[in-house]
Amino acid sequence: MALSDSIGDFLTRIRNAQLAMHRATRVLFSKMNSSILEILKEEGYILDYEKQVVDNLPSFIVKLKYYEKSPVISDIVRVSKPGCRRYSKYKDISKAYNGLGIFIISTPKGVMTDYNAHKLKVGGEVLCRVF
């Protein structure tokens, strides 16, 4: 069965694993997922991730992060969906949760956080919101 929204599946797997208090979860491999995972790691939302190949299918093992037995990621939501894309100019990019969270944006200069997109004065597709 083919996925119509691999990013949505990726975010849902992370959300469900954190709610179930799992130490790690497996997500599908893609360049976009790799870019999002790198941002989540840099911003401190996950501990680490590594690529694995099982039965000739590449995937990532994501090591989830907790603080005092609570998930670090309290909210991770897909913003731009396949049926309704959301784009934003750099001037219109607001801070997620008054600066406590981040938006992850796909721009012509690569996938980056809302802060970096605003700093580089570049807009793009708002992929997800993390808090």
Swiss-Prot record:
Signal peptide from the UniProt entry: none
GO CC term, one of those recorded: ribonucleoprotein complex
UniProt KW rRNA-binding keyword: yes
PROSITE patterns: RIBOSOMAL_S8
BP terms from Gene Ontology: translation
A Pfam family annotated for this UniProt entry: Ribosomal_S8
Keyword list, A-Z: Ribonucleoprotein, Ribosomal protein, RNA-binding, rRNA-binding
Gene Ontology molecular functions: rRNA binding; structural constituent of ribosome
Assembly: Part of the 30S ribosomal subunit. Contacts proteins S5 and S12.
Function: One of the primary rRNA binding proteins, it binds directly to 16S rRNA central domain where it helps coordinate assembly of the platform of the 30S subunit.
UniProt family annotation: Belongs to the universal ribosomal protein uS8 family.
Name of the featured protein: Small ribosomal subunit protein uS8
Annotated source species: Wolbachia sp. subsp. Drosophila simulans (strain wRi)
